[in-house]
Structures are given as structure tokens and as C-alpha cells.
Amino acid sequence: MIVVKIGGSVVCKDPTKVVENLPNYADKAVVVHGGGCLVNDLLKRMGVEPKFLTHPGGLVSRYTDLETLKVFVMAMSWINKSIVASLHALGVEALGLTGADLGVVKARRKEKVLVVDERGRQRVVDGGYVGRVVDIAVDKLRPPPLKVLSPVAVSERGELLNIDGDQLAFDVAKRLGAERLVLLSDVDGLIIGGSVVPRLTAAQAEELVKNEEVRGGMKRKLLMAAEAAKLGLEVVISNGLVDKPIDAALSGRGTHVVKG
């Protein structure tokens, strides 16, 4: 089994090549997608400026109040069904789900989170409608049909929650016992000094998180990849905009993070 995460940058630029490659993996994959760029676009069209929180360590996450949550769910639903429709056009039986459907992904709401403000001070703020995964009904995700999962979970109180897409993909892969997790974005992998780093051990990945060239979403990807690799799960960070991107990633393209 493999888990393929289609990053928001790919979703918003051109997911065609990923979707066209998925029929080769319809019987052995689970797909997770992002789409934060569409959320940002919709919010701005509504006159709402997207808000982000910086956490100790430099990780950045979206602040999701109730109004943002509504837009988030709307955007993810559009992306999800668009991918599923494209797969059906290719002859692939696919089922689009949020984590709330069938109770597939259950999460606990983060009531409070620690952030770093614009003055560099740490403080605790309301967590909004963001969750941490506590359970995944993996048997409901196994193919057939090919499942396409959006990063929306449900709490024990019946609340819809925003879940980080990369983290959800990792949690799905871990619970499925997948062999590989393929993270597809609009870059060729981890780039240090202008070149792609082809292979890393978990320990090396953890160390590189401190590198000034590693920023934003790549920092989160490396931390998660290191954790996954320690469990024996190979993580590939690769480009989803190239021809046959899944084939390419599994054949050595991108950055491969392995146990060691």
C-alpha cells in the first residue's frame, strides 16, 4: 500500500498529471489532498484576510475560526469531488470522502495553542476549529474503490475540524501499514544549496530542520518524514507537476527519507 498526498500547490496549479497517473495505483493506494490556496482565494473574495499562527520552532498553521471553517470545508469539497470526477472519466472507481464521512477520521479539537506573536513573545491563544487526529477507521479506506480523502475530521462532539493535510497523510499511512508515503508539491524535493537532497535518514532529516534554507511547509514535511521513517515508512517528497509524478517519485525522483 502507498499513500499519495496531493499538495495544495499542485491542486491549485495543475493536478492533471497526478490524477492521470493514479489509475496505475487504484488497487493499492489511498489519496489525501490539500488545497489551502483555494481557501485563501475564497476568503479574499469574501473580503476576509486569511490568518496564520506561528508556533515555537517556526511551524506555521492556519487560524480557523467558524467562518474560515465553513470556507475550508467548501473548498475541500470542491477539490475532492473534482478529483473524483476526473478519476471516473479515466475509468477509475473512486470514492471521495471527508474524515467526517463514515466517521473515518476522528479528531480532538485543540482548545488552546502556543504561538509566537509579532514581537517574538510566546502566548496561548484559542485553537479555533483545528484538530489533532485521534483515530482513523483504516478498513474503510482500503481499496477498492480508490478513496480520495480531504483533510476535514469530526470531533466526538460532532464538530467539523481542519486537519493538517500532510499530518493526515502520515497518520493514514502509519495506521494502514503502508510501505511508502508520497508527498507531492510544486518543488522537486528538499533543496539545499540549490540542489535536491536525494536521500536522508531520519536523523539527518531532524538535523536539517534547523537549516535556514528549510522553511514553511518543508519544515513540517521533514519533521513528519523523520517520525515516519523511524517507524519504517519511507517518505518521498517530490514534484507533482512533472509527467507521471507518482511513478517518478517511486523510481527515485525527489527526496527519500528512510529509517537510519
UniProtKB/Swiss-Prot annotation:
Substrate binds at G35, G36, R62, N162. Its EC number is 2.7.2.17, 2.7.2.19. GO terms for cellular component: cytoplasm. It is an enzyme of class 2 (transferase). SUPFAM superfamilies: Carbamate kinase-like. GO terms for biological process: arginine biosynthetic process via ornithine; L-arginine biosynthetic process; lysine biosynthetic process via aminoadipic acid. It holds the Pfam family AA_kinase. Keywords: Amino-acid biosynthesis, Arginine biosynthesis, ATP-binding, Cytoplasm, Kinase, Lysine biosynthesis, Nucleotide-binding, Transferase. InterPro entries: AceGlu_kinase-like_sf, AcgluKinase_fam, Asp/Glu/Uridylate_kinase, LysZ. Pathway: Amino-acid biosynthesis; L-lysine biosynthesis via AAA pathway; L-lysine from L-alpha-aminoadipate (Thermus route): step 2/5; Amino-acid biosynthesis; L-arginine biosynthesis. CDD domains: AAK_NAGK-UC. The keyword Oxidoreductase does not apply. It catalyses: [amino-group carrier protein]-C-terminal-N-(1,4-dicarboxybutan-1-yl)-L-glutamine + ATP = [amino-group carrier protein]-C-terminal-N-(1-carboxy-5-phosphooxy-5-oxopentan-1-yl)-L-glutamine + ADP; [amino-group carrier protein]-C-terminal-gamma-(L-glutamyl)-L-glutamate + ATP = [amino-group carrier protein]-C-terminal-gamma-(5-phospho-L-glutamyl)-L-glutamate + ADP. The keyword Metal-binding does not apply. Its main location: cytoplasm. The record marks K5, K221 as: Transition state stabilizer. It comes from the Archaea. Coiled coil: none annotated. Involved in both the arginine and lysine biosynthetic pathways. Phosphorylates the LysW-bound precursors glutamate (for arginine biosynthesis), respectively alpha-aminoadipate (for lysine biosynthesis). Belongs to the acetylglutamate kinase family. LysZ subfamily. This is Putative [LysW]-aminoadipate/[LysW]-glutamate kinase.
